[in-house]
Swiss-Prot record:
Catalyzes the reversible interconversion of serine and glycine with tetrahydrofolate (THF) serving as the one-carbon carrier. This reaction serves as the major source of one-carbon groups required for the biosynthesis of purines, thymidylate, methionine, and other important biomolecules. Also exhibits THF-independent aldolase activity toward beta-hydroxyamino acids, producing glycine and aldehydes, via a retro-aldol mechanism. This is Serine hydroxymethyltransferase. It comes from Synechococcus sp. (strain CC9605). Its cofactor is pyridoxal 5'-phosphate. NCBIfam families: PRK00011.1. Its EC number is 2.1.2.1. HAMAP family: SHMT (MF_00051).
Length: 431
């Protein structure tokens, strides 16, 4: 018998920890048999998952490529350098840092590099579609800085750039944040640049939700207009869960590098960075542009059909992957609607809408996104059918027969558009 036989590190997960293996396979089954409409979620490729589940998880590599504090980094250096080059090529940036563990970490590093506690920042109100890290009082960004929040116009539910300009002129922020978590319309980055220049502010674009659309050229890019751009690497970009910082200025780049390490993080996650590199490579392919165009077309189809069925959509439609329902039009809360669609295997999230009278735990909205199901192959016609299932369920919450029909239609759609190639064979995938 060899010395290697029977070692704990050689056991498969199913042998080593059957409980965790079972939970993973249950989650795999849930993803296969439910319609994923959470706007911040997507399905990573098998290649991305293989990179993330590799031996790279064993390697510590504090510092930057060729400037590490540990030995044995020659291979992770090559991987990280490739991830950086692909990110720069994908977004037309002069510099990239691929080490942030998340979008929130990327934003925090930018704040650390450019701001001092007590400085004034401007960001979109969370209830109007902003993000926690853009100055919400429950987040460190809202505790360390003087926050001025702008909102959308009450009638159009779109950004009013002149109102934002007047607010900036009044408060003279040191940094303005644009880019959002629940704003379904195109962002005018050039207009934000003009405002930032007028008041002498830095301009940060958080494109976490639209990064894939930007990469594919189906949404305007913030990179030419902003001092710094942050993003996650999942969502519409379809990579692993992680963060990324981009900029055009070499002096800023040095500050951001130091703000990531040693300023706010220790060792980078090289297995995740490898998965980011794979995802960036996928996004550089022509097929990714076609995918992103379909994401936007599918969102338009979903919004149009829901409106046709009598449900209001915030701003009257969408220009990106997000469709935000205003359920006040049907006398329902987001909390109730979320439970109703979840009960027929549609996964979404309750969400505040502009000028929402309900609390964030109840809300008047339901947020959908089309990136994940588009990855499964759903087209516009399939999304119209999804809209009908949603409407049937919301308008008939007590009808068991309609509930069952909704479940049947969801099941049929999942069979028609399997998640991974082996989904129909029910093979467990632990990568």
């Amino acid at each position: 018998m060899s010395q290697a036989s029977g070692r704990a590190i050689d056991a498969d997960l199913a042998q080593s920890d059957p409980d965790i293996a079972a939970f993973i396979n249950q989650e795999r089954q849930r993803q296969e048999t439910h319609l994923e409409l959470i706007a911040s979620e997507n399905f990573a490729s098998r290649a991305v998952m293989q990179a993330q589940g590799s031996v790279l998880t064993n390697k510590y590599a504090e510092g930057l490529p060729s400037k590490r504090y540990y030995g044995g980094c020659e291979h992770v250096d090559a991987i990280e350098e490739l991830a950086i080059e692909r990110a720069k090529q994908l977004f037309g940036a002069a510099w990239a840092n691929v080490q942030p563990h998340s979008g929130a970490q990327a934003n925090f590093a930018v704040f650390l590099a450019l701001l001092q506690p007590g400085d004034t920042i401007m960001g979109l109100d969370l209830s109007h579609g902003g993000h926690l890290t853009h100055g919400s009082p429950v987040n460190v960004s809202g505790k360390w800085f003087n926050v001025v929040q702008y909102g959308v116009d009450k009638e159009t539910q779109r950004l009013d750039m002149e109102a934002i300009r007047q607010l900036a002129l009044e408060h003279k922020p040191k940094l303005i944040v644009c880019g959002y978590s629940a704003y379904p319309r195109t962002i005018d980055f050039a207009a934000f640049r003009a405002i930032a220049d007028e008041v002498g502010a830095y301009l940060l674009a958080d494109m976490a939700h639209i990064a894939g659309l930007v990469a594919a050229g189906v949404h305007p890019s913030p990179v030419p207009h902003c001092d710094v751009v942050t993003t996650t690497t999942h969502k519409t970009l379809r990579g692993p869960r992680g963060g990324l910082i981009l900029c055009r200025d070499a002096e800023f780049a040095k500050k951001f590098d130091k703000a990531v390490f040693p300023g706010s993080q220790g060792g980078p996650l090289e297995h995740v960075i490898a998965a980011k590199a794979v995802a960036f490579g996928e996004a550089l392919q022509p097929s990714f542009k076609a995918y992103s165009q379909q994401v936007v077309a599918n969102a338009a189809a979903l919004a149009e059909q829901l409106i046709a069925r009598g449900i209001d959509v915030v701003s009257g439609g969408t220009d990106n992957h997000v469709v935000l329902l205003d359920l006040r039009s049907i006398g329902m809360t987001g909390k109730v609607a979320d439970l109703l669609v979840s009960d027929v295997h549609i996964t979404a999230n309750k969400n505040t809408v502009p000028f929402d009278p309900e609390s964030p735990f109840v809300t008047s909205g339901l947020r959908f996104g089309t990136a994940a199901l588009t990855t499964r192959g759903f087209d516009s016609q399939a999304f119209r059918e999804v809209a009908d299932v949603i409407a049937d369920r919301l308008f008939n919450p007590e009808d068991d027969a309609i509930r069952q029909r909704c479940l049947d239609r969801v099941g049929a759609l999942c069979e028609r558009f399997p998640l991974y190639a082996d989904s129909k064979h029910k093979q467990p995938v632990l990568v």
